[in-house]
């Protein structure tokens, strides 16, 4: 090595490499300047707007809000200008086509306090249809019967089991809650079975079609449970009241599955039957009828794929917002970015789409505050 004080050319070229001229389209990274008066006690809408050029997941959260506002504000043709066969999907109060918004969420989000946010959306008819895992059905009902409590992630499982306490992350659900759930749901299942049997007796030449009183589906049972719970704190109550279908293709995967299993013995030899084929026809038909389709998917797995696959039936959704923490290296559905769904035809190539890598319990209340709840509902 030379003792010269001259900067080595190799190092100089590597460290001081010249950039191309910055394109006019580049946006400068900026955050929130709390030294300005406008930043104090900032509204959610303004906070989200200030996060737009912050980078990382802050920018993705802001983009998610833009996409949700886009699906909410989209308007198509007036119903009077459409031929009869095109008068499908949803229309606003003035008769213009509007987006059909599919919302999916996993059960843990209903177990958490996010349930109240989800209930708000259903209460005010801000979504068109829901897909949930089984826990998202039962936990909503159980919370009417008895509360869920704060715990800690680190509580030992053996001690909790001895105490009859079930842990969901840092939430605690006394096992007595599930006993109360059984006491509440069994008489309802008895009545549903009775109605199904009556429908079977009256079944005519049309056979067992989807409109038959003898045909019970998961969504029909969920609607009935929402009616029977009759409590305004419940998501399912408002779904029933506002005629918003709630689909749960894995309804047996949880406590409600336990109750259905137990009921097959109590009701022997007759057993209630639920038709999942009629439900997939109903969900897919909603998608095909939609003049514009948006997806808001909180979590991954079954709830995410079920909605994405329904949107395949119309050659893809027009808007998509994913919120989950899944990574794509293992090929999981939760980890897949929206671009993977584009390859399958489940999201349109030109769709507005984003994946927010975050815990939905943190970011979704903020997103709702800046979109659906930015103004008081009528």
UniProtKB/Swiss-Prot annotation:
SUPFAM superfamilies per UniProt: DHS-like NAD/FAD-binding domain (SSF52467)
Active site: 346 (nucleophile)
Residues the record lists as binding NAD(+): 107-111, 133-135, 139, 253, 300, 325-326, 359-360
Entry keywords, A to Z: Hypusine biosynthesis, NAD, Transferase
Gene3D superfamilies in the record: Deoxyhypusine synthase
Top-level taxonomic group: Eukaryota
Record EC number: 2.5.1.46
Pathway where this protein functions: Protein modification; eIF5A hypusination
UniProt cofactor(s): NAD(+)
Reaction it catalyzes: [eIF5A protein]-L-lysine + spermidine = [eIF5A protein]-deoxyhypusine + propane-1,3-diamine
Xref: InterPro entries: Deoxyhypusine_synthase (IPR002773), Deoxyhypusine_synthase_sf (IPR036982), DHS-like_NAD/FAD-binding_dom (IPR029035)
GO cellular component: cytoplasm
PANTHER family: DEOXYHYPUSINE SYNTHASE (PTHR11703:SF0)
Purpose: Catalyzes the NAD-dependent oxidative cleavage of spermidine and the subsequent transfer of the butylamine moiety of spermidine to the epsilon-amino group of a specific lysine residue of the eIF-5A precursor protein to form the intermediate deoxyhypusine residue.
Annotated family: Belongs to the deoxyhypusine synthase family.
Name of the protein described by the UniProt record: Deoxyhypusine synthase
Organism: Debaryomyces hansenii (strain ATCC 36239 / CBS 767 / BCRC 21394 / JCM 1990 / NBRC 0083 / IGC 2968)
């Amino acid at each position: 090595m030379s003792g010269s004080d001259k900067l080595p050319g190799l190092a100089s070229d590597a460290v001081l490499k010249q950039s191309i001229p910055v394109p006019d389209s580049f946006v400068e990274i900026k955050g929130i300047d709390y030294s300005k008066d406008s930043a104090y006690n900032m509204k959610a809408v303004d906070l989200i707007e200030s996060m737009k050029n912050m980078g990382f997941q802050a920018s993705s959260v802001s983009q998610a809000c833009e996409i949700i506002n886009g699906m909410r504000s989209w308007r198509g043709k007036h119903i009077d200008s459409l031929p009869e066969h095109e008068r499908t999907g949803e229309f606003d109060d003035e008769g213009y086509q509007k987006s059909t918004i599919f919302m999916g969420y996993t059960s843990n989000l209903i177990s958490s306090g996010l349930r109240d946010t989800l209930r708000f959306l259903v209460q005010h008819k801000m979504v068109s249809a829901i897909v949930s895992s089984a826990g998202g059905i039962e936990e909503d009902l159980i919370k009417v019967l008895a509360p869920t409590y704060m715990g800690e992630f680190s509580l030992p499982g053996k001690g909790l089991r001895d105490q009859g306490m079930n842990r969901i992350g840092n939430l605690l659900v006394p096992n007595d809650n599930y006993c109360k759930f059984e006491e509440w749901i069994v008489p309802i299942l008895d009545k549903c079975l009775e109605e199904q049997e009556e429908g079977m007796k009256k079944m005519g030449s049309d056979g067992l079609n989807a409109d038959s009183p003898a045909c019970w589906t998961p969504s029909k049972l969920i609607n009935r449970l929402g009616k029977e719970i009759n409590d305004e704190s419940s998501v399912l109550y408002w779904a029933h009241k506002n005629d918003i279908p709630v689909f749960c293709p894995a309804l047996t995967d949880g406590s409600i599955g336990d109750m259905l299993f137990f009921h097959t013995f109590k009701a022997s030899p007759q057993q209630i039957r639920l038709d999942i084929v009629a439900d997939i026809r109903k969900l897919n038909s909603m998608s095909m009828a939609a003049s514009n389709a948006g997806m808001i998917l909180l979590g991954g797995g079954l709830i995410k794929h079920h909605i994405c696959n329904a949107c395949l039936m119309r050659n893809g959704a027009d808007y998509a917002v994913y919120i989950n923490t899944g990574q794509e290296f293992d090929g999981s559905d939760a980890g897949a970015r929206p671009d993977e769904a584009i390859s399958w035809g489940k999201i349109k190539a030109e769709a507005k789409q984003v994946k927010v890598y975050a815990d939905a319990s943190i970011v979704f209340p903020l997103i709702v505050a800046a979109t659906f709840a930015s103004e008081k509902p009528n």
